[in-house]
Amino acid sequence: MRYHALTCIGSFNTRLLGAVAAAATLLAPVYAHAQSAPMLTKALPADGYYANSYPPGAPFRSWLDMVSASQAAQPNWMTPLVTVTPRLEQEFRYDQYDQKNGTGSQGNGQRLISYGGPGGARVELIPSYDWEVILAPPPYVTASGPKGMAAGFGDWPAFLVKYRLAYGNAEHGDYIVTAFFQMTDALGTDGKISTNVTTAQPTIAFGKGWGDFDIQSTVSVQIPVEALNVPGGPSAQTNIRNFGDPILWNTAFQYHLFKYFWPELEVNYEHWSNGEHVGLTQVLLTPGLILGRFPIGYDTPTRPINLIIGAGYQIAVTANPVTQNNFVGTFRITF
């Protein structure tokens, strides 16, 4: 049974919200065709997206032309390992997490191995000029430790939608500001795999580049909207209350070196003003290296398909953390 924090509605409404948001985003190009085109920094072919809507017989090519123009108008940085980039991306992405939680009073001591990472094995799409939608199945997670052994699907990252507010490529200021909205649905898997709380997460993201160096940052709050009753465990109301409203601030400092090398250092900050971790501030440092973009093919004669790989290691630098350390690996194919 689920308990809704506001009106006691069921989980169907959460899934319906996700479906409506995803459908609206995917249909955005239909609306976009009726609008005047934004100022572009890259010319499009005569049969491109803004020349004549979707030309008969070439809708896929026309859509890719639009995606190319959209990405050419923003900074060309690499997506960090943990911080969600404010850039609009179009790619398949798979992450691997091996996380060890803290053993003090704030942690539960569990080791969680996530196949897909918290975002799941996901597809990121740019359906219209300033929009991105991320869709993913739940990640598969194994757990071991003092809270028991378990395996199953982690909480479902139902959708994440981005809207780009302001931006300029390297020739026009090298900056970007983007708004996100994400819903994550609790699936209730044992072994502390699930939080048992469905959350909404509004985010503001921004970045600035100076030559080969850039900073990308996000600030967000996780808002619990409903929760599960755990058989033999906490009630849904208790799970809502324990979760709190944590504030997350992630920042990546990144440098581009020798064409394919992107070393970075991320600072991952989280603070709980209420809930079971009330008063706790946790900071993780994540040094990492991303390699790419390696061309492995072409969508169109001018749009490459790229391979990206990377790895990093998160480690807590504050006392009594919820998360002690975490190995992060990433594999991506842009298209």
What are these regions (language model features)?
Residues 1-60:
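Cleavable N-terminal export/targeting peptides
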Residues 34-335:
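Transmembrane beta-barrel domains of Gram-negative outer membranes and organellar outer membranes
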